[in-house]
Amino acid sequence: MASNSAFSLFLILLIITQCLSVLNAAKDFDFFYFVQQWPGSYCDTKQSCCYPTTGKPAADFGIHGLWPNNNDGTYPSNCDPNSPYDQSQISDLISSMQQNWPTLACPSGSGSTFWSHEWEKHGTCAESVLTNQHAYFKKALDLKNQIDLLSILQGADIHPDGESYDLVNIRNAIKSAIGYTPWIQCNVDQSGNSQLYQVYICVDGSGSSLIECPIFPGGKCGTSIEFPTF
């Protein structure tokens, strides 16, 4: 009788723990960073790059990730080891991902290793909102379609031509187009020149609306930065 009571208590505690886990997951982040990167700035660094097995990507910004983040600058990661990347769940998105979310890491790959990393590190932490892999990757693709950075910049006469542009003009061009302030991340080319690398745009915790970023990442750019060719 005592053993049955103990087992029942164990089950109750297990259920309570699981419920609390679900509640905590729902509160595990405050907003998303949606990050796009310029391939020319990835490839002209000292570490260089490798084109994916599908060939050289288009000269366009590519998705880096959709990352849950907290207002204090911390972020959750690797939240659900029971939800490994499963490409069969996103088979209808692969063609679009190869175009809009290409890998440039070496050695050359199809993109699956990159996408697996993004899902398992970041996507699993958004399951309370974007409930499965298809929803997560589709949301990122939809945001890419919504925020056409290259067209925005070219419309402001800012082109990937290897020339330098004022950082404030790049930031203002994007803000004028989307209504919110982006964060510009720079890296340096092989000659040590500061260049446009990644653009961070913030999305609310439901994944439905762009917002002003509650906090920006660290790092800084020069007042004038290159926009390299690709």
From Swiss-Prot:
Residues 1-25 form the signal peptide. It is found in: Secreted, Extracellular space; Secreted, Cell wall. Gene3D superfamilies: Ribonuclease T2-like. Its EC number is 4.6.1.19. Pfam families: Ribonuclease_T2 (PF00445). GO terms for molecular function: ribonuclease T2 activity; RNA binding; RNA endonuclease activity. Induction: By phosphate starvation. One of its GO terms (biological process) is RNA catabolic process. Its main location: secreted. Keywords: Cell wall, Disulfide bond, Endonuclease, Hydrolase, Lyase, Nuclease, Secreted, Signal, Stress response. RNA binds at residues 37, 64, 114, 117-118, 121-122. The active site is at residues 64, 118, 122. SUPFAM superfamilies: Ribonuclease Rh-like. Disulfide bonds join 43-49, 50-106, 79-125, 186-221, 202-213. InterPro entries: Ribonuclease_T2_eukaryotic, RNase_T2-like, RNase_T2-like_sf, RNase_T2_His_AS_1, RNase_T2_His_AS_2. It catalyses: a ribonucleotidyl-ribonucleotide-RNA + H2O = a 3'-end 3'-phospho-ribonucleotide-RNA + a 5'-end dephospho-ribonucleoside-RNA + H(+). One of its GO terms (cellular component) is extracellular region. The keyword Protein biosynthesis does not apply. It is an enzyme of class 4 (lyase). Probably involved in plant phosphate-starvation rescue system. PANTHER family: RIBONUCLEASE 1 (PTHR11240:SF72), RIBONUCLEASE T2 (PTHR11240). Belongs to the RNase T2 family. This is Extracellular ribonuclease LE. It comes from Solanum lycopersicum (Tomato).
